[in-house]
Amino acid sequence: MYYKKSKLNSVVKNIPEYRQPKEVYKLLFFYNPDILIITGHDGMLNKESNYYNIDNYRNSKYFIEAVKEARRYEREYFKSLVIFAGACQSYYEALISAGANFASSPSRILIDFIEPLIVAKKVAVTNNEKYLTIDDIYKELKNGKGGISGIGAYGKAQKILL
């Protein structure tokens, strides 16, 4: 619904987190998108635990593996893919290290389900000559930089010359 209102072409697949690493490659091959959102449900299993231990997260390991599979697809098919990955309280640093351009949640907070969509829309409508950073997006996000951050990406919109 959000993408239809924005007049963006999108495909939405509801895939359980544990299956995402196994499904993402073939979906990328079939749909050949410019932007990929890997999300679902996540959370820290013990809030007083070490932030940097993958075993302390419900589903971050699956998102990380899905990002790696997406980057493998990108290398094999010479694709330039922008990836958002993560959910509430996800292991942000590992998602970025795996290859996500934007991820949640640097402050290990809950994010609104619409926030990854806002990031994807901003990438989609920004000219491909402009490099977007979280500084270009965070004011539109409910939780700002605490919920989502990243290394950035070039926009995907193309200029049309007549």
Which functions belong to the PLM regions below?
Residues 12-19:
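Short beta->alpha junction loops
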Residues 107-162:
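C-terminal functional extensions of proteins
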Residues 45-63:
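A short, glycine/acidic-enriched catalytic loop
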Residues 2-11:
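Short helix-loop-beta junction
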Residues 44-45, 112:
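Short glycine-rich, flexible loops that bind phosphorylated cofactors or substrates
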Residues 20-24, 91:
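Short acidic active-site motifs
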Residues 28-42, 100:
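Proline-aspartate-enriched helix->loop->beta-strand connector
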